[in-house]
Amino acid sequence: MSTQANGSTPEPIEKVSIIVSKGSLEGVYPGLIMANGARMEGIEANLFFTFFGLDAISKAKHENVKVATVGNPGLHLATWAGGIPGVSSLVTHKLAQEMEKLDIPPIPEFVEMIAESGAGLYACKASVDLFGLEREDFVDEVQDVITVGEFYGLAAGGQIIFT
């Protein structure tokens, strides 16, 4: 274990609460990977899906989350090229192939796996209301639709990570 600048040993992380706010493939996976890693290390984990991050747990959208190709600096692709029809699907397909080689499951399977590991999955009530959604619009692994205040209650005593 490493030591801090003052020579003390840092306290181990016991709980993380991860906010997933983006609905693109590269916006959803970091939160899922971090939650999965936390559970594998025995760390309590909660995922709070808000705004377009709700796509990852939406019955209608979770199987079709794509890479955002327009204006994505990580792709090193001209903005105009990212907007060409089919580019997002092509890049998403290629990335999915690479993730499969690394045993990284598709979003629906990953969400199920993380929930089965004991992590909590929650939808943001404000975002659910904003988009006119209902509890029934989400996959069964979602434990509840909660307010920001309730999320802070769940996160108390742990680390909050915004992806």
Language-model regions: role of each:
Residues 18-28, 57, 98-102:
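Short, glycine-rich nucleotide/cofactor-binding loops
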Residues 45-51, 122-125:
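Short internal beta-strands
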Residues 90-145, 149, 153-156:
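A charged, amphipathic interaction segment
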Residues 53-66:
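N-terminal beta-loop-helix "entrance" segment that forms/cooperates
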Residues 1-27, 33-36:
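N-terminal glycine-/serine-/threonine-rich phosphate-binding loop
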Residues 29-42, 47:
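Histidine-anchored nucleotide/phosphate-binding helix
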Residues 65-106:
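A glycine-rich helix N-cap at a beta->alpha junction
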Residues 11-15, 72, 157-158:
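Polar low-complexity intrinsically disordered regions
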